[in-house]
């Protein structure tokens, strides 16, 4: 691993080995605080592969090594507010369904943001249609936050959807993009917004999902050297600039030249403790090793193995559900969103959907799965997904469990259908509207 890295990055062997050995001991604070010199170069190359796809963007991303995607979210929100890029009362757009904390953080008193929902449509294979993307043309929307591939629906942006966003940026070059791409490595050839629109994008990544290392707390914040964040700060009125001068004046004699990425570092330790900022040194060594392992695997055997596991479990769940699904090249197989309303409408009809909404509480599904089958799933409503949906994770359980999940979900759906038919019969409509056996 060490000889490969020395050759690949033209490292001085002694300096690289010293960084590894000195850091694994963990006897002092990170220097530089944002990220170790060799680690940043290695992680930069890893992110180019994992996030940017082809063609790679020109120039360099500056990276801040952080304690997982969670810390990346917290630090980013805090610095956007501290630097008056997003202010209380401002409006952002959220690509929904989305990881629940993005919905919750916007409402916190700390930020007090309004948000517009940009909906990925299930009937459009969870891509954002043109009419939804056009909402971003509204000048009051300052930023678009997105998880790509999605959580809970597990679909990456298609080339067509990325183009739609690009069309918006041509008219709104001031629009901030924040993309959380934790699941990108589960889609071969994945293309992040930070690869397509580096100037407008702040990229968040975590190693936790792909390497199964949640407990290590390894994540990154990446901002291109040519970015609109620094430009927005530079255009602040003099009154705000003076306030920011005071905030960051203890760090440098020229605080107005301090890049946004370095302000994030300082803000992560409330500025006053900036000298203690940064991801712990042993964690950074682990980040180096994970990144090098993937870069050295030119045949992508590890990626294929990970995808193979998830695909096998997905297939078992689908078999248990006894449904047929078409292929989707942008599906990452990490999660699956099972929407009872969508499938009831597709296989039975609109009448049973109306009956469900009148007679079944959306949480009934997850409670019955837990009480009757010992299966614990998250309800989709918490992600701003359809109310009668549940999220299945294909990364956590033994293979044999997934066909059980499929059969249990199907049994609950069958129970709803039987209750629906019983109500029809009770009202004298059973013979007329009984569900055909082929649709059961």
Walk through the language-model features, giving the residues of each.
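Short, flexible/disordered intra-domain loops and linkers
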Residues: 2-8, 23-31, 121-127, 153-159, ...
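Conserved core of the PLP fold type I
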Residues: 12-15, 23-174, 184-198, 202, ...
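Walker B catalytic acidic pair
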Residues: 180-181
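Extended, charge-rich helix/loop segments that form flexible
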Residues: 241-297
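PLP-dependent enzyme catalytic core of the Aspartate aminotransferase-like
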Residues: 34-37, 41, 49-57, 134, ...
